[in-house]
């Protein structure tokens, strides 16, 4: 059984981005979106191009602090699972994270954005928080049917809606 990462949130988190479960590279590095070909950090860099530093080239600690300063948070729908490799289709025996406590950790939380289809399968679970829920295209390199530009446009739309940009 593999265990996921703890939530990366703060009391200032307004939009929580929920993935499914960290891939092998992310688990090994103990970092969200740690695979070098994942589009997550490049999308954020493109949304905030005037940031004082190159977020993609920064240390994980700096990226994490920067993300939190933007009102964003990260977590996954699965706390643990069995899986060989990194593909969501290989996830077996998943254990859901307890999302109910998020409102205490994040009193300003205004919405949940699911990063990809596997995460969005649990939208009914996140809707119980009484917040708007969005499905965003997966930033995974396995999601080759969406171009970077198309993913960027979809992500930007949700961030704009919540005044994060």
Can you name each region flagged by the protein language model?
Residues 44, 122-123:
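Hydrophobic packing residues within well-ordered alpha-helices of enzyme cores
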């Amino acid at each position: 059984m593999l265990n996921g990462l703890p939530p990366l949130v703060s009391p200032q988190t307004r939009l929580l981005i929920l993935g499914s479960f960290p891939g092998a590279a992310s688990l090994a590095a103990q970092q969200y979106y740690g695979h070098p070909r994942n589009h997550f950090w490049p999308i954020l860099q493109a949304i905030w191009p005037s940031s004082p530093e190159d977020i993609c080239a920064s240390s994980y600690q700096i990226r994490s602090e920067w993300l939190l300063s933007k009102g964003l948070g990260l977590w996954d729908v699965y706390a643990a699972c069995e899986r060989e490799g990194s593909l969501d289709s290989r996830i077996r025996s998943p254990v859901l994270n307890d999302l109910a406590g998020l409102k205490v950790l994040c009193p300003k939380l205004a919405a949940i954005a699911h990063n990809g289809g596997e995460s969005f399968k649990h939208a009914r679970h996140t809707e119980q928080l009484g917040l708007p829920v969005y499905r965003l295209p997966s930033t995974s390199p396995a999601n080759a049917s969406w171009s970077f530009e198309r993913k960027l446009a979809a992500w930007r739309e949700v961030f704009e809606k919540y005044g994060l940009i």
